């Protein structure tokens, strides 16, 4: 098929604009975040070292692997989450019956005594390992460690939350989340994935992702708030971060995500935080299903993919629903105010209109 020369010229201009935007904006953002990460991890490692002295069951898993820290997630340039992996889930069964959207529980295996578990005092009378009880104990230990550590003048615990959150130099927020890694397991609530008839991802990658498994996090679950569920405090939040990152390898998918995050930080950091980098990552995964071929993710297609993701974001904001990629019954907009979502839809449309109508738009964005 012959492609009109003016279309090729427009594509070439957009590729040039994208490359320039990556050099001028995306790389600067990455460099700033990298600098923050070095300080954040140095301070948190010191705090966790103190925690481990008080309670050897909470062993720090925050280690540097060739410049990347295991368990570190960048929420925004000033907000980070660090996952601390706990040991010995052994005598506990993973229970995922769908009654707790986005969550599951860990229950003592039939016939096993509480005393066989490393976490004996956090197991409820019904035999569930309570995520809230573990987090409460961890929060107390971290608070004590902050008072003793070498960085006590610049790191403070954030009060009025059941989460373990630190404020560093009054401007950086770090959440430290206890978790269990569930390798070789795949939750029943995500068993529909991948959808039949969709060629992406490749079956080999699907097998790899399911073997890698998922994480169970001890954190507040917005999906359960207001349900008065007796299980709410005991439930663990399902996290698929490693699976998501594996799926986004190859072609220009990661680059596309970096551009989306940069545009979000510069233009969609709005009151009420209606649009997060995780929303964009989720919609990017859906876009990968719509455009399964590798050639659709080459650099001359990135602008089209970004516009497609923003149009999908507008639709989600207007419908006030953004389904989780692996757990579509879970709404990622739950807890966001209708006013914040409506305002965000207008802002995203303004941004998308600029990108659709001005080939040199990235010079100004």
From Swiss-Prot:
Residue pairs linked by disulfide bridges in the UniProt entry: none
Assigned GO CC terms: cytoplasm; nucleus
GO-annotated biological processes: eye development
Family (UniProt): Belongs to the mab-21 family.
Official protein name in the record: Protein mab-21
Organism the protein comes from: Drosophila melanogaster (Fruit fly)
Gene name as annotated: mab-21
